[in-house]
Structures are given as structure tokens and as C-alpha cells.
Amino acid sequence: EADVQHILDAIESGNTTPEDIANLTVPDHYTGALLRQEDESMFDGVATRDRDPRKSLRIEDVPTPELGPGEALIAVMASSINYNTVWSSIFEPVSTFGFLRRYGRTSPLAKRHDLPYHVIGSDLAGVVLRTGPGVHAWKHGDEAVAHCQSVELESPLGHDDTMLDPEQRIWGFETNFGGLAQLALVKSNQLLDKPAHLTWEEAASPGLVNSTAYRQLVSRNGAGMKQGDIVLIWGASGGLGSYA
């Protein structure tokens, strides 16, 4: 029976062609870091500082999701931890299963995300294994990083700024099939070329924090900061603060 390890081994060999990737068998299951809906109440009455993610996070096999239009299945070579991951794992400020339920009600395709488990993680660097209908910019074998914003782009409000789209969500936090796993499901418009000079780990680290800092501080719809401005960065030691 095929498993994901043969895919990762092929990629790491360094001499695998796109045709080789296309011919690899994608298994019907993979391993991921996940939360279980049955554990939602495990920290009830426990102070935030005493909630231990090691008690809620599980490493388990889950079914490989079917690809929908505009989506890509990625072999994850590296991922990253951020506050979304911590919040998810301690069910604060709310359980992420509420996000999955609400998302699942929006369309038959989104219903795939409403499951009794949640594969989390909002960063990755990896290799495109398969693409869904309508994806033309990416093909199997492409090395990519994924940013965290999952957006439907059906509302005109998001055409100028996707942060204003009423259906924008954080992938792996408000959606399922996140990056802390062997495989991940993303929208193809989340993908960017992996910089060739970066390792997998280096490429996987900045996605969420870098894009968040840029959007909020530098972009025309953010604070409009520019070189030479004198600013105070509150909490500058973390990932987001460091990029800020």
C-alpha cells in the first residue's frame, strides 16, 4: 500500500522530474497533527496558562481529501508554528470546530472541511503533487510556499483587497487540511514560488507573519508606514513582531 514517505523520499533525492512526480501514487491517507472535536471541552475550567497543547494535539492518519476546482494538493516538506496553532490547540478564544461548521454550510465543496477532526497549521513549503480543475499556473513538481489566506473571491468586496472579502479565512485555522501534516490542501491562489536560495524550513517560516505584518503596516490599506517613520513595535520578539 502506498504511503506518503515514498513521495517525500523521491523529492529529497534531488533528481526527481515533474514527470516522476506525476507518476507517483498519491495515497488515500496521510499523517497530520490534528485536534479532535470530542476534546473541545477538555480544558474547561483550566486557566489559559495551564492549558497544555500536548494533551490536545494528536498525530494520526486521516483520509486524503479530494481536490476541488482551483485547489492544489501539496507534499509538505516543512511547516511552521504560529499563534493560530497555539490558539487552536487550547481551544481559545473559541474552538475552531465552530469555524469548520460555519464554513461547511457555505457550499457543498466547503462541506469537506466540516469533520470531527481538524488538521491544523497555516504555513508550508512543499511540492505540488496534484491540481484541481481550472488550475493552470501550477503543475506537479513545482516547489512552492503557501500563504495563509483562503478566499473565495466571489464577492466584489475582496477584488481590491482580499482582507475585505466576507468569505476570507485563515487556512489551517478556519479551514481544514492545514500545513502541519505530510499533505495539505490549499487554494492555488495561496501559492508562491519557493525561493531557490532558501531551505524548506526557511521558506516555510515567514508566510503568515510576514504577510500579516506587511498588510497591516505597509500596504495602502494598512497603516501606510514608510522608510524613515519612527514607530514602536509592541512585542517585537516573536515572528510577527520581528517582521514588523
Task: Explain the meaning of each model-derived region.
Residues 26-33:
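Short structural boundary motif marking the start of a folded domain
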Residues 30, 142, 228-230:
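Nucleotide donor/acceptor-binding cores
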Residues 10-11, 39-55, 92-114, 154-167, ...:
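Charged, glycine/proline-rich intrinsically disordered loops and linkers
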Residues 185-193, 197:
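Structured surface patches comprising rigid loops and adjacent beta-strands/short helices at the edges
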Residues 92, 151-161, 175-188:
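A structural motif shared across PLP-dependent enzymes of the aminotransferase-like
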Residues 198-244:
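Mid-domain Rossmann-like dinucleotide-binding core that forms the NAD(H)/NADP(H) cofactor-binding site
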Residues 7-24, 40-78, 83, 111, ...:
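A short N-terminal beta-strand-loop micro-motif at the entrance of redox/enzyme domains
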Residues 63-80, 93-155, 195:
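Glycine-rich beta-strand-centered segment in the early N-terminal region that forms part
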